[in-house]
Amino acid sequence: MSFGKKEYWEDWVLEEEDEVFKIMKAAYDAGIRTFDTANIYSAGVSEELVGKFIRKYEIPRSSIVIMSKCFSPVRKDLIKLYMDLSSRGVQLHDSPELANQCGLSRKHIFDAVQDSVKRLGTYIDVLQIHRYDPHVSAEEVMRALNDVVESGKVRYIGASTMRYYQFIELQNTAEKHGWHKFISMQNYHNLLYREEEREMIPYCQKTGVGLIPWSPLARGLLTRSIDANEETIRSKTDLYTRALEFGAGYKAILSRVEELAKKYNVSMATLATAWSLHKGDYPIVGISKVERLQDALASVTLKLNEEDIKYLEEPYCPVPIQGEI
């Protein structure tokens, strides 16, 4: 999501190809082998950059994992409309402009996969459904996903951003028919939002579904002090950041992240990501600078003890369900 084109996405997107490839190459050289993107990110430009990176550096295809997503529209003229309607809770199927341009119908899944493979220039290792679609039957969704795997264009399927009961419905449908099931769940989970720990995460852990949460740093809020006056382009313009709600323990959590980061002489970002890794997650991190990559890599070697974990989690208070925009 961090790479693409400002015109098609957000002002904080990195669009200079040399800088993008510099970060991706640094990640690859450091041992990072999984790259997560989506067809909607910058109207497909993000996927194109992943494909260009592989070809530019002649990366052996078998050495990396490419994850992409389908659900949303990709046409440049429809993305802003889609984002606006989604943020206001408007039913997407009520918009004639979005007919057959988004959702999880068999037609749209097939079209989305075909276009993503073309932009990437290769197959997709893990195709994730970006959202749950209440207007398409579980049978249609899971059969279509099974068929794109059987076609060879996709190797595995994953899910993202949905309620526990919705995920269960889809998994059970696939199991009933002997179709391919989801191997991963990309949900919203971090120190400021832990509602997924009630049902989704225990289920995934019990059934062997990999957890790869998005926004482990809560849209960057876990990277700076509560008293910091720093305002980034993203914090001022990001639709999702403005939609977040926090519990009564929000300030205490940030304060404790800052305190422990100083104790271990690491950044707050490193500390917060280390917590995510400790919970058994494999978080998706967005990187726009090489220095931020170093913060993420440092989290792998930072081992928090149980006292640290308890101290960080203690102030948490329940909050409304989020992350489904």
UniProtKB/Swiss-Prot annotation:
EC number per UniProt: 1.1.1.-
Family: Belongs to the aldo/keto reductase family. Aldo/keto reductase 2 subfamily.
Superkingdom of source: Eukaryota
Keywords: Oxidoreductase
Keyword Lyase included in the entry's annotation: no
SUPFAM superfamilies: NAD(P)-linked oxidoreductase
Protein name (Swiss-Prot/TrEMBL): Putative aryl-alcohol dehydrogenase C750.01
GO MF term set: oxidoreductase activity
Broad enzyme group: oxidoreductase
Organism: Schizosaccharomyces pombe (strain 972 / ATCC 24843)
Keyword match tRNA processing: no
Pfam families xrefs: Aldo_ket_red (PF00248)
